[in-house]
A protein has these predicted regions:
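PP2C/PPM-type serine/threonine phosphatase catalytic domain
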Residues: 1-194
Length: 194
């Protein structure tokens, strides 16, 4: 299993995205894209806190109960964001997509508008996640679910699927899939071709 990753800032601003990839073995990987919420305070700090929390939970490896491990990481991120929000007197939050692969099994979760795609050997690319977004009558979009520093752990659904023999899994921020040069753009691609 191989991976590539890329993250770049939008035009004239700080990169508010963070990428984390942990590969404990050739058959295991944890990959995540965090997209700090630009409408809140310190989005780049929010996404880094999320990435650090996941790293802390998964640094000892992928356990047998992966959904519980993902929930623990998101709970830790909420706790850390809440502390940082209080310390700064600010509002922090981020959208996040996480993929955990162990052998031929994948667990994934997305909160906000970070997307996860699966391309199988027949080149059919399908979206595995739904955006947690509400668009008002003026066309302004708002996240309806995200990791934020208010002490409230969001509703987290962890999905599981068996992977085909050959696949590509992509986790990407809205700046990537909307191809907007103004927004930050981040992607992690995991490839299994052997």
């Amino acid at each position: 299993m191989k991976y590539t990753s890329s993250s770049k800032a939008g035009t004239g601003k700080t990169n508010e995205d963070a990428i984390l990839v942990i590969q404990p073995s050739l058959e295991e990987i944890v990959a995540m894209v965090c997209d700090g919420m630009g409408g809140l305070d310190f989005p780049e700090i929010a996404s880094e806190i999320m990435a650090t929390s996941v790293k802390d939970v998964f640094s000892a490896g992928i356990r047998d109960n992966v959904p519980e491990q993902i929930h623990s990481a998101f709970a830790l991120a909420t706790e850390e964001l809440t502390k940082e929000s209080a310390r700064r007197g600010a509002r922090l939050g981020c959208a996040v997509g996480i993929v955990v692969i162990k052998a031929k099994v994948m667990w994934y979760s997305s909160i906000g508008n970070v997307r996860i795609y699966l391309t199988e050997s027949d080149i059919t690319k399908r979206l595995l996640t739904q955006d947690d977004v509400y668009t008002d009558e003026k066309g302004v979009s708002y996240l309806t679910n995200c990791i934020k520093g208010n002490g409230s752990i969001p509703d987290i659904q962890v999905m599981k699927l068996t992977l085909p023999e050959h696949y590509i899994v992509e986790t990407c921020s809205d700046g990537y899939y909307e191809s907007n040069p103004i927004d930050d753009s981040s992607i992690v691609s995991i490839l299994q071709t052997d």
